[in-house]
């Protein structure tokens, strides 16, 4: 099974992806996580350092695939999760989609691409041009990371458009949304009412999730010294269980941008309950912006 994880930049995709990967490994799966971001920090939480990228390795070998061994590009992370970083072209030049294609090509040359039960693509930001939508060409499912905020749901809506487009020629389905570090769900619920799709899980605001990223550790690793965090891991195990159930998934139909703006802004501009509630909702909006 191949899964592509998308979402607004800074929403916590890499942290979420790493914890999902470990959760899947805990369920007995052989997992490979592929970071698809020029920052090449997707797997930092699994390995504790920035591993060499596929592109760096190819360049050092003058693109002679026959001179590259699996251990040159596949690094072992926490919990037995294997890690690969695609890397990216120089800033302002080249195409990220080409890099993803070269990564998959090399893994196939190494007979590694089909050796895993789960391959998880962690894709940069909310860029859904043809280049960075490339992982969708290989994925069975897409998971969108969001929060209860305006911008994150706008990004999610654009990603659904890419899923719909790719699903025309490829058996791709949206598994659902994962809400990350959010105390409320009103905007998420309003969005999925208008654009029907599953909500896999919603994680509350837990500071240790952010701290784990800084420490370069997954929540599962942190539990070793902080057993009180075990309850957080259960969220990721629940996500893993839902993925492993091979959900039917959907091909979503995005909402037109102006319609979505009107839909979400209406909750704040015309709340039920009058001015006091309006002020409270506006304060909540500012709160989500700070997050």
Swiss-Prot record:
Kindly report the protein's main subcellular placement as a broad class: plastid
Q: What is this protein called?
A: Light-independent protochlorophyllide reductase iron-sulfur ATP-binding protein
List, alphabetically, the InterPro entries matched.
NifH/chlL_CS, NifH/frxC, P-loop_NTPase, Protochlorophyllide_ATP-bd
Explain how, and how many, cofactor molecules are bound: Binds 1 [4Fe-4S] cluster per dimer.
* EC number(s) given by UniProt: 1.3.7.7
Q: Where in the cell is it found?
A: Plastid, Chloroplast
State the encoding gene. Answer: chlL
Extract the GO molecular function terms from the UniProt entry: 4 iron, 4 sulfur cluster binding; ATP binding; metal ion binding; oxidoreductase activity, acting on iron-sulfur proteins as donors; oxidoreductase activity, acting on the CH-CH group of donors, iron-sulfur protein as acceptor
GO biological process terms held by the UniProt record? light-independent chlorophyll biosynthetic process; photosynthesis, dark reaction
Q: Please list the disulfide bridges.
A: none
The Gene Ontology CC terms held by the record are: chloroplast
Q: Which Gene3D superfamilies match?
A: P-loop containing nucleotide triphosphate hydrolases
Which keywords fit this entry according to its UniProt record?
4Fe-4S, ATP-binding, Chlorophyll biosynthesis, Chloroplast, Iron, Iron-sulfur, Magnesium, Metal-binding, Nucleotide-binding, Oxidoreductase, Photosynthesis, Plastid
| UniProt entry tagged with the keyword Metal-binding | yes
> Cross-referenced NCBIfam families, in alphabetical order?
DPOR_bchL (TIGR01281)
- The residues that the entry says bind [4Fe-4S] cluster are 95, 129
Species of origin: Larix decidua
Q: Does the keyword Glycoprotein apply?
A: no
Q: Which domain of life is it from?
A: Eukaryota
* Cofactor(s), by name: [4Fe-4S] cluster
Q: Which Pfam family, giving just one, matches this sequence?
A: Fer4_NifH
Which pathway is it part of?
Answer: Porphyrin-containing compound metabolism; chlorophyll biosynthesis (light-independent)
- Family indicated by similarity: Belongs to the NifH/BchL/ChlL family.
Binding locations of Mg(2+): 14
